[in-house]
Amino acid sequence: MFIGEYNHALDTKNRIIIPSKFREELGDNFILTKGLDGCLYVYPLGEWKVLEEKLKKLPLTNHNARAFVRFFFSGANEVSLDKQGRVLVPQNLIEYASINKEIISIGVSTRIEIWSKEKWVEYNESSVDMNAIAEKMSELGI
């Protein structure tokens, strides 16, 4: 399980360090893709396969399903760590997530999210009403 929040930076070669607490669970190869809310998602291959199977079952006749599958798969890259625990982030994903230099990596149970520091701060300072969200989660049995 991925948990926690870590600050680090993109280097001049578009590499980021994956926090050591995340590396063992990720394995040697993993998936880096576009996420929702303007961040990047990182999935261990096993979790990606589970998600892939669910997405393959979505109906091709549904416009929203097709759009979501395109969004998710078009940004996906299988990547691996170098000996220093860094991963090369493709330019299209850097642009998508508006990553300049400072980044925040957060553990979100089965995935990691990579945010530009600016977007993470903005997200946390936004008018997100956690009380209202908690109430909705209660309705879902959480």
UniProtKB/Swiss-Prot annotation:
Gene Ontology process terms (BP): negative regulation of DNA-templated transcription initiation
Family annotation (InterPro entries): MraZ, MraZ_C, MraZ_dom, MraZ_N, MraZ_sf, SpoVT-AbrB_dom, SpoVT-AbrB_sf
Domain SpoVT-AbrB: 5-47, 76-119
Location in or out of the cell: Cytoplasm, Nucleoid
GO CC term, one of those recorded: cytoplasm
Molecular function per GO: DNA-binding transcription factor activity; transcription cis-regulatory region binding
Keywords: Cytoplasm, DNA-binding, Repeat, Transcription, Transcription regulation
HAMAP family, per the entry: MraZ (MF_01008)
Stated family: Belongs to the MraZ family.
Subunit relationships: Forms oligomers.
Name of this protein: Transcriptional regulator MraZ
Organism whose genome encodes this protein: Clostridium acetobutylicum (strain ATCC 824 / DSM 792 / JCM 1419 / IAM 19013 / LMG 5710 / NBRC 13948 / NRRL B-527 / VKM B-1787 / 2291 / W)
Organism ancestry: Bacteria, Bacillati, Bacillota, Clostridia, Eubacteriales
This protein's encoding gene: mraZ
